[in-house]
Amino acid sequence: MLVNMNEVLRPAKKNKYAVGLFNAVNLELARGIIAAAESSRSPVIMGTAEILLPYGPLEEVSYYLIPMAKKASVPVVVHLDHGLTYDTCIKALELGFSSIMYDCSTDSYEENVRKVKEMADIAHSYGATIEGELGHVGDNEGSAEGSDHLADPSAFFTDPKLAKDFVEKTGVDALAIAVGNAHGAYKLPPKLDFERIRTIANTVDVPLVLHGGSGLTDNDFRKAIQEGISKVNIFTDINVAAVEAEFKKFQSMDKGLIDLIPAAVEAVKQESLVKMKLFSSDGKADIKNNQNVSANDIEALTKLVAAEVAKYLNK
């Protein structure tokens, strides 16, 4: 079933587990992710990122992600990860994505707040949820803080006091934080600031997101979730698992592309299952969001009702 992030992350925050976001730039990845979620009875977040659009255009990806989510027997969020531009975020909402991330973390704090607040209002009017980012998660070129490794890494970490202000001013439904994590496979061992995670989790009332999950140790994940992480982003691990399975299959056959597909799907399924069990989201598909309706929900519902009334009056 297609749901937004509130439906899966609020129960996760309350019950101390995390839901994985797995990016699916093609049908094989999507099939493996859904298969894992259904077999483990895990809620799941599936989507793509703006940086991945050259490998799977947003509109084309929506043609299979959204129908697959609706058909699934478990809650599935279809999410735009790291939307970098206003137009891409709007397009995702128009296509039916149930959640977006508007990443303005490299802007000034004031500009980040302004832009994300504007997009949050729009997303909520669609009944969708939105994730923002505060602090800067690097791209891992040489250290856990990417190309910024020559500077003090902690300078890019999320400030707990600003986190509270950011959430209150923007109305985001989830907050991605920088605590020593980085995108891509780690070249040097990461050092997560678990105390910072705990402090932020106790300061804000929305679920926290850990980007750059691929490459962290199992203990890193467990402790991060224990301290307050409710959503973990994964791509590198399933991407590598798929290509390794295809290469192994290719070496043992003399057939064509379609013979590689089952191997890729199964590899993605198995790697996703490992993560779902590690995050303790397995068996949680039927946990309902029983938290009180938020101000964002009320605002979104009010806008939807107003829009319907306006349509009626203009007939």
What do these predicted ranges mean?
Residues 1, 16-19, 80, 175, ...:
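Intrinsic structural disorder
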